[in-house]
Design a protein with these regions (language model features):
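Short strand-loop junctions, especially beta-strand C-caps/beta-turns
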Residues: 18-20, 104, 133, 160
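Active-site beta-loop-alpha junctions enriched in small/polar residues
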Residues: 48, 106, 160-162
Length: 190
């Protein structure tokens, strides 16, 4: 039986109301919660192979963040492991159904490897949907990684459940993903 996966990218406090938060990020939280609730998935690593899956990623940095390549280019401490900013937004946490995948970089090779293994050993994935933050950094990075790891699986990004650093960069990222054969749904027409 074909399966669908919902990947919830970095719906963490620091990206919503914390050090890198935006009004656009705050606005999508109820939509993301609604999407998760309507998806009906179970825990990523232990669910029945015929069930739909919801996977969560966590942007995760250590105390030496400002010394990293990313930190030198974005010198704003955020998502330091164990802090309030690293935690999922409370409404998203309340509907979380799986163990988050920590990622110290924009894209998660670990997420791609887990989904490729599921696709290979448990039967083909029908579709991978992505939602979350930030469209123009981590959502696009994970979408492109997944496209490279699973080129024959349909990838969809729900634009109404994503927000970028700015509305303009959000829109540019959606256009870039469309150009890479990633379907964008619920987006404004450009």
């Amino acid at each position: 039986m074909a399966k669908k996966v919902l990947v919830v990218v970095d719906m963490q406090n620091d990206f919503i109301t914390g050090s890198l938060g935006t009004p656009e990020a705050q606005a999508i939280v109820p939509k993301v919660v609604e999407k998760i609730q309507g998806f009906g998935g179970t825990v990523l690593y232990t669910q029945d192979s015929a069930a739909d899956v919801i996977a969560f990623t966590f942007d995760t940095h250590r105390c030496d963040y400002l010394e990293t390549q990313e930190g030198r280019n974005l010198p704003v401490e955020h998502c330091l492991k164990g802090t309030w900013g690293w935690q999922l937004e409370p409404r998203v946490e309340a509907v979380r159904t799986s163990t988050p995948i920590e990622k110290p970089t924009f894209g998660s090779k670990g997420l791609a490897e887990v989904l490729k293994a599921r696709h290979t050993y448990e039967g083909p994935l029908e579709e991978i949907q992505l939602v979350g933050l930030c469209t123009d950094i981590c959502v696009i990075s994970n979408a492109l990684l997944l496209k490279a790891f699973l080129p024959e699986v349909k990838l969809t990004v729900d634009a109404s459940c994503c927000a970028g650093v700015t509305p303009e960069s959000h829109q540019r990222a959606l256009e870039a993903m469309k150009a890479c054969q990633i379907e964008v749904v619920n987006g404004e027409q450009t």
